[in-house]
Amino acid sequence: MAICKVNYEIKNFNLDEAKEIIKTRPQNLSLNEMFMVANSYPKGSQEFIDVFETAVRMYPKDEIASINAAAAALSRNDLVSAERYLNMVNVNKQLPEYSNAMGVLMLLKGEYEHAEEYLKAAAKSGLQAAGQNLEELAKKKTNAAEIEKIENRDK
């Protein structure tokens, strides 16, 4: 029986290096490393969005990556991509982040009743952004009701 000894070193994560790697060899980064790179950019910036879209391409079965990519798509008002990413989620539909993203999608599509259901579920779970989105939904509903009154009055 032969006994072999192998020594190896694990390289520490370097954010600046990871920012370069994601552009050329994203397959060399873990999903967590991609998340750290994304969060090093301003939320909603093109770089932030690009990293989340790269993550969902590299890890298409990871539902958190899909939810993050959907949120990034929603931030740039890309409803088609957001819906596609959210449709990739099967198991984690109870996550407040999923419900919030679906609520925002429904809000932007003008489906206020569905939006309210999703956003209330997310807010009930304690997601602060969902509460803010519910406030935005209330404003949209009020505006829509005012517009309808004006249109009906002018007939």
Language-model regions, residue ranges each:
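N-terminal targeting segments with Sec-dependent signals, encompassing both cleavable signal peptides
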Residues: M1-K155
